């Protein structure tokens, strides 16, 4: 459960990334594909090379969805309902991949905003990303 302080920390971080959605999203995906190559199996039709237009476009979608969840932090399930349906019913993404993506996102935040990622903010972001992952996997059951 996200506390009021967690919510404030998450909103603070996401206020810094809105103008970098494509860049940070693509970097998160590239990092995930490199670190966890098994995640590439969901993107057989993508050019997965650095700088790929497809990775940039999908990265922007990922970052935009995370921003949407942060903007509706009191109703993440409502904000991501359609995305949850898509991943559970059509794409059938292995739920562990959401955790891997979250870890890569935290690394990207640490690289670009090291002073903002205090231990407290890191913990808040981790809780938020777990909440997002739980929402995205809730319709698998």
Swiss-Prot record:
O2 binds at residue 58. Transmembrane segments: none annotated. This is Hemoglobin subunit alpha. Signal peptide: none annotated. SUPFAM superfamilies: Globin-like. It comes from the Eukaryota. GO terms for cellular component: blood microparticle; haptoglobin-hemoglobin complex; hemoglobin complex. Keywords: Heme, Iron, Metal-binding, Oxygen transport, Transport. The keyword Cytoplasm does not apply. Belongs to the globin family. Heme b binds at residue 87. Involved in oxygen transport from the lung to the various peripheral tissues. Red blood cells. Pfam families: Globin.
């Amino acid at each position: 459960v996200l506390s009021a302080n967690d919510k404030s920390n998450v909103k603070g971080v996401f206020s810094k990334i809105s103008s970098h959605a494509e860049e940070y999203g693509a970097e998160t995906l590239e990092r995930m594909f490199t670190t966890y190559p098994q995640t590439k199996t969901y993107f057989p039709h993508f050019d997965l090379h650095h700088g790929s237009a497809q990775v940039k476009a999908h990265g922007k979608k990922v970052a935009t969805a995370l921003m949407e969840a942060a903007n509706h932090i009191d109703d993440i399930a409502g904000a991501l309902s359609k995305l949850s349906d898509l991943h559970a019913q059509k794409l059938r993404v292995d739920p562990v991949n959401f955790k891997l993506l979250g870890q890569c996102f935290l690394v990207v935040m640490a690289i670009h905003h090291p002073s903002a990622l205090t231990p407290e903010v890191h913990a808040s972001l981790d809780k938020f990303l777990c909440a997002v992952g739980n929402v995205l996997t809730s319709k698998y059951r």
